[in-house]
Structure formats: C-alpha cells, structure tokens
Amino acid sequence: MTLQKPKGTQDILPQETVKWQYVENVARKTFKKYHYGEIRTPMFERYEVISRSVGDTTDIVTKEMYDFHDKGDRHITLRPEGTAPVVRSYVENKLFAPEVQKPVKVFYIGSMFRYERPQAGRLREFHQLGVECFGSNNPAIDAETIAMAYQLFNELGIKDVTLHLNSLGNKESRKAYRQALIDYLIPMKDKLSKDSQRRLEENPLRVLDSKEKEDKEAVENAPSILDYLDDDSQAHFQGVRDMLEVLDIPYVIDTNMVRGLDYYNHTIFEFITQVDKSELTLCAGGRYDSLVEYFGGPATAGFGFGLGLERLLLVIDKQKINLPVDNSLDVYIAVLGAAANSTALELIQAIRKQGFSAERDYLSRKIKAQFKSADVFKTKLIMTLGESEVETGQVAVKNNFTRQEIAVSFEEIKTDFASVFKQLGSDRP
C-alpha cells in the first residue's frame, strides 16, 4: 500500500513555502503597525472551549469538528477556529488584570481543522491569520480592525475586494429580530431545506446564512435586522460606518449576513472577492462583547477577524500577482576532486557565518552539471575549487550574470567576503 497524506490536507513544498512566508511576513509587519503582538495557543483544546462558545447548533460543532477522547478520557477537539482559544487564553492568563495595558491586541498564525468537503481554498487542515482586540467597545476599534485587513490586502496587491457590513445589535435587538424572523419563516417552513428547518427551531438567524437555493429564495424578502436595532445598537453601527467613510473604505450593507458563529454581536463583516465567477470570502470577523465573560472573565468587549491563508494565496494566484520572493543563492562552490572536499566545506561555512547564503556540490558530479545547478539556484557568485586552488590558497570568484571574475585568497573569503561580494557588483545581503 502506498502511504499518502490524509484527504483534505496538503504538502507545502519549498517553492510554495516562500510565498507563504512572504504573505505571513507582510501580515506580521502590518499587524505590528497597529501594535499587535503574536499569541500561540495549543492546536487542540477541551471540547467545551469550542462547542459552548462557537455554538452547539452551529455546523462547525454538529458536522465539522475533529473531536476525540484521549487516553485520560478527556474530550478533546482540534481547533476549528482561532477566536475561542485566544479568549480562553486571555482569561486563563488574566490579561484582563489592571496592570495589563488596554486594549490588549494579539494576532495568531496557525493550522485549523474542519471536516468538510475539500475544494479550492477550503481544506480539512487549513491555515489562518487572525487578530483579536480586547477591552474597548469604541466603534473606532471596529473600523480600525477592518482597516487593518483592508491595508493588508493593499500591501499584497490584491484588488476587487468588497467589504460587506452588517450589525447583529445587542442581546435585546437580536431577541426582537429573532421573533420577527420566526414569524416570517414559519409559513414557508416546508419550502426550506432540511438543515434550515432544524435551524428554524434552534437558531433561526442561521437560515439567513444558508447557501441552499431554496433557503436563499425564502429569505429574499425577510425582515432586516437593522430595523430592529435599539438606539444604542444603531448609534454603534452608525459610528462604525462614519469612521469607515472617514478612512475612505467603501462598503455595502448586507442584512442577510449573520456569520457562522454564535458569539457575535453588533458589527460583523466579510471581505468578499470573485474567483472563477464564484464569490469567495477572504476575511471575516466582528464584535463579541460577552465571550470573555462566558469563559469566566470580567465583562470585556472584543473584536477580531480570521483570514484563510490558502484562500489568500489562491486569490493572489488567480489575480496573477507576482510576489517579490527571492529564491536566489549568493554563492555556489563547484567542487572538483576529493582533495578539495574539506576545503570547500571550510570556505562555505565561513561564507555562511558572514551572513550569505551558500551551497556546494556534494555528489562529485561533472563540472557542467554543477554549473547547471548554480543556474537553477539563480546563483550570484560562483567559485570552482579543485586541487590546484587548494595548493595555491586562492580561487577565482565569478559573477554568474556579468561574468566578471577576480582572484581571491582563502583568507579574504574567510574574513571579509562582503568586500568580495561588493567588488563583483553586489551588496551585502
């Protein structure tokens, strides 16, 4: 039997990981500008951390979670999303304490797991960038966090992304809207999908989020949640909209958007783009002002978003964006004969210690094959080391692009390779 990776997973090979690393580094730099620090939480959590916070009736919990009992009979789940683990960590580590500066801003990058049908940009193990901000209910936080995602897309050169915006209001507003939605949907219950018939009993707002054709038709003329917002909820949402306009970030109001997680209130948003004539959600998030309290902490406002790396890279590929990744090699040493083997290793280590990337031949190949490898690696400088070079203590170093060549002593290579690099038309990396 041939052993293969599990369905819905992928091997990310070196020629692709450089793109991932570039995107992750751009994200880190962008988040740092907004004073976010990185947090790393376990890849698995107690089942209740996810089920109770995300919602027992959500598709994530009822259909998509990877959960199991470990050898100590503890109910464990691989994390399907990043917010609940971060909130658990915020409470467990008492980041709400008065000595901790507020708001607390953190970001994470890591694997998430959901059992769903694999397709382009959607895998069972996927990678997510996410941010969470704790300690302020100021609508400026909502607008700033949305602006940060918008800036990240701009930094990466991604175009044609539309911001969809909605408000779920506070608890009282949602309660009033929930009843209005039930009253609207009950007469057409038999026309809904089986899942939405169940949702109507458990959490009717979920029907708005259904992708089934019959459900979309049913909610086309559903009442708008914006008509049920109380004064405080309206003021908060208007504040967010006003600030987005100040920041010149265009948006559309999408009253059917509810998000797939139960902990949201007030502002929710998605950045959506088109891929092969289909809508693709690139980034989504919102406000969750009761989640910290739910985990046993004090009442604390929260706002954040999650962004799928696979989807982001898919859009970058579809939009033919050339990421400025550098796979080139500074130095390649072609090695001729056993007499040069030890010296080649000594020189290449000295070059690396001075901050340069370097590679050499280890396979005793013919010189033509070694030069071909240097070209494949997009090598800037090449040196050929054989028995005569070892005897004289110097070697010819050649610019692989201009063909300029100089003779350099081993001692200079070991102590000041930067000057050699510069003489041949390159600057220190």
UniProtKB/Swiss-Prot annotation:
- Which subcellular locations apply to this protein? Cytoplasm
Predominant cellular place of this UniProt entry's protein: cytoplasm
Keyword field: Aminoacyl-tRNA synthetase, ATP-binding, Cytoplasm, Ligase, Nucleotide-binding, Protein biosynthesis
Which Gene Ontology terms of cellular component type are present?
A: cytoplasm
> Does Aminoacyl-tRNA synthetase count among this protein's keywords?
yes
GO biological process, alphabetically ordered: histidyl-tRNA aminoacylation
Which reaction(s) does the protein catalyse, per the Swiss-Prot or TrEMBL entry?
tRNA(His) + L-histidine + ATP = L-histidyl-tRNA(His) + AMP + diphosphate + H(+)
Q: What is its EC number?
A: 6.1.1.21
- Write one Gene Ontology MF term: catalytic activity, acting on a protein
Q: Does Aminoacyl-tRNA synthetase appear among the keywords?
A: yes
Looking up PANTHER family in the UniProt record yields: HISTIDINE--TRNA LIGASE, MITOCHONDRIAL-RELATED, HISTIDYL-TRNA SYNTHETASE
Q: Self-association or partners: how does it assemble?
A: Homodimer.
| Family listed | Belongs to the class-II aminoacyl-tRNA synthetase family.
What's the protein here called? Histidine--tRNA ligase
Query: What is the source species?
Result: Streptococcus mutans serotype c (strain ATCC 700610 / UA159)
